[in-house]
Amino acid sequence: MKIIHTADWHLGKILNGKQLLEDQAYILDMFVEKMKEEEPDIIVIAGDLYDTTYPSKDAIMLLEQAIGKLNLELRIPIIIISGNHDGKERLNYGASWFEHNQLFIRTDFTSINSPIEINGVNFYTLPYATVSEMKHYFEDDTIETHQQGITRCIETIAPEIDEDAVNILISHLTVQGGKTSDSERPLTIGTVESVQKGVFDIFDYVMLGHLHHPFSIEDDKIKYSGSLLQYSFSEAGQAKGYRRVTINDGIINDVFIPLKPLRQLEIISGEYNDVINEKVHVKNKDNYLHFKLKNMSHITDPMMSLKQIYPNTLALTNETFNYNEENNAIEISEKDDMSIIEMFYKHITDKELSDIQSKKIKNILENELRKED
């Protein structure tokens, strides 16, 4: 049996003001073409299909087109669960009749009680749920963390699980120790959101969504597919794609398959003048770029200048302020007020104070000293 594991499409994502629908349409077209080659028995999408609970019309159409090609044209069964970014009601609309085409949409965590059987494999679905939802359902005020809530959910099906069959869990959560990135919205506020690996011992394999790094954790049976695209500059350089999972005679193996995006996220560090004069290495001028540059404080609008050469510049950080704090603290402690101001101005502008500026500052300092006296 061949299973394709994917998650975290985040359709409709906007990165630093840039709409990523073109990039998402490109990668989904590539994914569909790959599925024609793979001919899987089933595709699993482990949550966060959309980036917001109220996706745009274009994002909805993009999902419909991709799912339509995979499920209706290629006749591939699909299991979808909701993630913390998805609107449950919208994602679940029409789910009952979609099942006639083997498109299974699960948005309620209680669906773990009704596994989906495909080719002798039991797929248990555990969509994203808040701690309060699980606490309310079980009528148990002692449930205060995701660890406690997820444990309780799994305990309800443990007595009924068929140990002679292959049992796979599909969920959307954070496993303790998993690598996170800036684009992952926290699952909870004020409580511990991670879940220990031991909770999943009764399953033969676990397919997860939420963390965007495909190798977020090192485990033989608990796996994240990672996101289809890089969605924050903390993910720059990360490979993105999907997992191919095979089951032969009860033995489960998986391999990560990378996909090449239309554009990647890239971080460029250096001197402003070197970047403007194209003396630094950039993999692709059309990539989404975050520049971290020094010696640019004298430039009126550096972002506009950068975009004339690198049109997809999305972020700019002034690195002029990066200096050794300990050494400077020692030096500053030995300086008078005027010298400190001169040093600070130099760090910000890379220039010396003019005579007029110095006189004005000295007058201000003298006036303040007289007030203290």
UniProtKB/Swiss-Prot annotation:
Q: What is this protein called?
A: Nuclease SbcCD subunit D
* The encoding gene: sbcD
Q: How does it assemble?
A: Heterodimer of SbcC and SbcD.
The GO molecular function terms of this record are: 3'-5' exonuclease activity; DNA binding; DNA exonuclease activity; endonuclease activity
Q: Does the keyword Ion transport apply?
A: no
Q: Which species is this UniProt entry from?
A: Staphylococcus aureus (strain NCTC 8325 / PS 47)
Domain of life of the native organism:
Bacteria
Name the InterPro entries on file: Calcineurin-like_PHP_ApaH, DNA_Repair-Maintenance_Comp, Metallo-depent_PP-like, Mre11_N, SbcCD_nuclease, SbcD, SbcD_C
Q: List the disulfide bonds.
A: none
Task performed by this protein:
SbcCD cleaves DNA hairpin structures. These structures can inhibit DNA replication and are intermediates in certain DNA recombination reactions. The complex acts as a 3'->5' double strand exonuclease that can open hairpins. It also has a 5' single-strand endonuclease activity. Is probably part of the SOS regulon and involved in DNA recombination and repair.
Q: Which PANTHER family does the annotation name?
A: COMPONENT OF ATP-DEPENDENT DSDNA EXONUCLEASE (PTHR30337), NUCLEASE SBCCD SUBUNIT D (PTHR30337:SF0)
Biological processes, Gene Ontology terms: DNA recombination; DNA repair; DNA replication; SOS response
A Pfam cross-reference name = SbcD_C
Keywords, ordered alphabetically: DNA damage, DNA recombination, DNA repair, DNA replication, Endonuclease, Exonuclease, Hydrolase, Nuclease, SOS response
State what induces this protein: Induced by ciprofloxacin and up-regulated by LexA.
Q: Does the keyword Nuclease apply?
A: yes
The similarity annotation says: Belongs to the SbcD family.
